[in-house]
Swiss-Prot record:
Name of this chain's protein: Translation initiation factor IF-1
Function: One of the essential components for the initiation of protein synthesis. Stabilizes the binding of IF-2 and IF-3 on the 30S subunit to which N-formylmethionyl-tRNA(fMet) subsequently binds. Helps modulate mRNA selection, yielding the 30S pre-initiation complex (PIC). Upon addition of the 50S ribosomal subunit IF-1, IF-2 and IF-3 are released leaving the mature 70S translation initiation complex.
All copies of domain S1-like, residue ranges: 1-72
Entry's localization field: Cytoplasm
Subunit architecture: Component of the 30S ribosomal translation pre-initiation complex which assembles on the 30S ribosome in the order IF-2 and IF-3, IF-1 and N-formylmethionyl-tRNA(fMet); mRNA recruitment can occur at any time during PIC assembly.
Gene Ontology molecular functions: ribosome binding; rRNA binding; translation initiation factor activity
Record organism: Lactobacillus delbrueckii subsp. bulgaricus (strain ATCC 11842 / DSM 20081 / BCRC 10696 / JCM 1002 / NBRC 13953 / NCIMB 11778 / NCTC 12712 / WDCM 00102 / Lb 14)
Keywords carried by this UniProt record: Cytoplasm, Initiation factor, Protein biosynthesis, RNA-binding, rRNA-binding
Length: 73
């Protein structure tokens, strides 16, 4: 899958799950399961419930995603 094939959407972190997984509610109302990207993990950026984030979704599975950016409050 090429990097051009990803779908980027904004959402809000609803819940924190084990293994750096998060439940994210997207702008369209759907709730997905998302994990943290390597760059966010590498720079020790903390993601907490209530944070606004950008999520990359694969066109093949729209229920799982990768958190790529956390907006500053």
């Amino acid at each position: 899958m090429a990097k051009d094939d990803v779908i980027e959407v904004e959402g809000k972190v609803v819940d924190t799950l084990p293994n750096a997984m998060f439940k994210v509610e997207l702008e369209n109302g759907a709730t997905i399961l998302a994990h943290v990207s390597g760059k966010i993990r590498m720079h020790y950026i903390r993601i907490l419930p209530g944070d606004r984030v950008t999520v990359e979704l694969s066109p093949y599975d729209l229920t799982k995603g990768r958190i790529t950016y956390r907006f500053i409050k």
